[in-house]
């Protein structure tokens, strides 16, 4: 399993604009190898909002299949370029090395 994050710096007070774009079912949910998505808002930033989109995939090839798909191009087509509230962004790939799950509570 891999996790891919896209961390975006957003003009202060506008993080919700990016978050709202992910608050509905999209096309990524239908992609082979897609395991889930979380949208994270960093707490206590002063000069800008920081939003991280974290996606989980069976393999890097599954993520690459998403980025090459017509669905990805459609989801990321910004008329007039990148929205002006996005100051910067960074993509990071992680290999998942250990996963721990909660134990059932004793009865």
From Swiss-Prot:
Which PROSITE patterns does the protein's record reference? ABM (PS51725)
* Spans traversing the lipid bilayer: none
Q: Which UniProt keywords apply?
A: Cytoplasm, Heme, Iron, Metal-binding, Monooxygenase, Oxidoreductase
Task: Kindly report the protein's main subcellular placement as a broad class.
Answer: cytoplasm
Location(s), subcellular: Cytoplasm
- CC terms in the record's Gene Ontology section: cytoplasm
GO annotation (BP), single? heme catabolic process
- Chain residues that bind Fe cation: 6
Q: Which reaction does it catalyse?
A: heme b + 3 reduced [NADPH--hemoprotein reductase] + 3 O2 = biliverdin IXalpha + CO + Fe(2+) + 3 oxidized [NADPH--hemoprotein reductase] + 3 H2O + H(+)
Domain named ABM: residues: 2-94
Question: Its Gene Ontology molecular function terms?
Answer: heme binding; heme oxygenase (decyclizing) activity; iron ion binding
Site (Transition state stabilizer): give the residues.
66
What InterPro entries does the record point to?
Answer: ABM_dom, Dimeric_a/b-barrel, Heme-degrading_MO, IsdG
Question: What EC class is this?
Answer: oxidoreductase
**Positions bound to heme:** 76
Q: EC?
A: 1.14.14.18
The family note in this entry says:
Belongs to the antibiotic biosynthesis monooxygenase family. Heme-degrading monooxygenase IsdG subfamily.
What is this protein's function per UniProt? Allows bacterial pathogens to use the host heme as an iron source. Catalyzes the oxidative degradation of the heme macrocyclic porphyrin ring to the biliverdin in the presence of a suitable electron donor such as ascorbate or NADPH--cytochrome P450 reductase, with subsequent release of free iron.
Subunit: Homodimer.
UniProt-recorded name of the protein: Heme-degrading monooxygenase
Species per Swiss-Prot/TrEMBL record: Bacillus thuringiensis subsp. konkukian (strain 97-27)
